[in-house]
Curated annotation (Swiss-Prot):
Record-marked site positions (Required for activity): S363
Alphabetical list of CDD domains matching this protein: ATP-synt_F1_alpha_C (cd18113), ATP-synt_F1_alpha_N (cd18116), F1-ATPase_alpha_CD (cd01132)
Catalytic activity: ATP + H2O + 4 H(+)(in) = ADP + phosphate + 5 H(+)(out)
Similarity annotation: Belongs to the ATPase alpha/beta chains family.
NCBIfam families for the chain: atpA, PRK13343.1
GO MF, any single term: proton-transporting ATP synthase activity, rotational mechanism
Name of the protein in its database record: ATP synthase subunit alpha, chloroplastic
Chief location bin: plastid
HAMAP family assigned: ATP_synth_alpha_bact (MF_01346)
Subunit: F-type ATPases have 2 components, CF(1) - the catalytic core - and CF(0) - the membrane proton channel. CF(1) has five subunits: alpha(3), beta(3), gamma(1), delta(1), epsilon(1). CF(0) has four main subunits: a, b, b' and c.
Binding sites annotated in the UniProt record for ATP: G170, D171, R172, Q173, T174, G175, K176, T177
Keywords (A to Z) from UniProt: ATP synthesis, ATP-binding, CF(1), Chloroplast, Hydrogen ion transport, Ion transport, Membrane, Nucleotide-binding, Plastid, Thylakoid, Translocase, Transport
Amino acid sequence: MVTIRADEISNIIRERIEQYNREVKIVNTGTVLQVGDGIARIHGLDEVMAGELVEFEEGTIGIALNLESNNVGVVLMGDGLLIQEGSSVKATGRIAQIPVSEAYLGRVINALAKPIDGRGEISASEFRLIESAAPGIISRRSVYEPLQTGLIAIDSMIPIGRGQRELIIGDRQTGKTAVATDTILNQQGQNVICVYVAIGQKASSVAQVVTTLQERGAMEYTIVVAETADSPATLQYLAPYTGAALAEYFMYRERHTLIIYDDPSKQAQAYRQMSLLLRRPPGREAYPGDVFYLHSRLLERAAKLSSSLGEGSMTALPIVETQSGDVSAYIPTNVISITDGQIFLSADLFNSGIRPAINVGISVSRVGSAAQIKAMKQVAGKLKLELAQFAELEAFAQFASDLDKATQNQLARGQRLRELLKQSQSAPLTVEEQIMTIYTGTNGYLDSLEVGQVRKFLVELRTYLKTNKPQFQEIISSTKTFTEEAEALLKEAIQEQMDRFILQEQA
């Protein structure tokens, strides 16, 4: 018979009691009532916050958007094909946030900041809320530094400043994305971090943009956030906020950032889809009542920070597609009223060979010449006025048969000015080259050339000026002013190049 040693048993029991650690874990849970179309209705989750992340049994994450009396409406961040009626859901206690770090530069990521370029994980130790408050009035200062796009038409007449929000608007296939990518290419060497957010675009279009940026060495300072047309509506809705959170990370580190949203109207459509499925009441064009707030809270995050916060900046270029030039639709009017100006691209100009197809007459920058260097102000002042007068005259000249000499000269000058605004895609110009081009046109040096010769002459003049008069570039870049010395150098170069050009053409 086995002897029971009471002291040994009591020691074991005592040890177990001492080691016992009473941990009580309270989890806020609920049950799936209904799931489908990217939406789940949950019973329970009594203390869930608006916008809180919830986790389903099979691992899918969702966001609690509708808090109703007897259920919670959750939008899914994934297809949710494995979620079943009756399965459990738990609240995480967290609002949507993403990891942020310098390591994101040069990468292509999705709305959850996960890499989708097949180049491995991205290391990050810091997190930022996807939706954070925009800087207040005291935290900002007025926009005063230029953000050069490299496009003459924009930098001279519709200047963009660091911290500004400028809308790019136009019909499909008018070169809106091309204007944005050229602006990214022109930031090379300017110490500006660029974020390109593709919302609901074709995967082939996004791949094309990424390839262009890689070939030109621009991916080194660029982050691409992509949620293509086949992504769930929730992720298309979140993508712009993810891009803004990444740009803010750099802005608060005293850096300059440029963010391009391509395009917010697709985000509004995704949000409309989510809202209608959540049975929120529809408003104009079936968009929910808070669609203005959707875009205003996003674009208000763009700012030029005050000197106490390090003077970082975030410049936003939202791109909105219109239907047959109708800017009075709901989303275009909303975004126009939020932004500090718009660049209007016209299908008629594009089809007539004027590219970039910027309609200078109705494009505007509300920051204006505050976002230009002095040299640009000096030469570009006359340009917009002359082009506006030319557009008016051209319309009138179609009906008039005999025009006086002065009108003919003005029409000839206008045609040449319009010609100098044309640029090839992915060929941005430096400020010095732009100043030289505008000066040559507005001072009548191109009047003696045929319209077809203008671009060829300007290309050769830029090369000639760079090799034979390097002091011109030095003066403009160091003083930011179009001095008399710079003007004399430029006049000399134009005259010398004109003589060479005429001899070449005659030969």
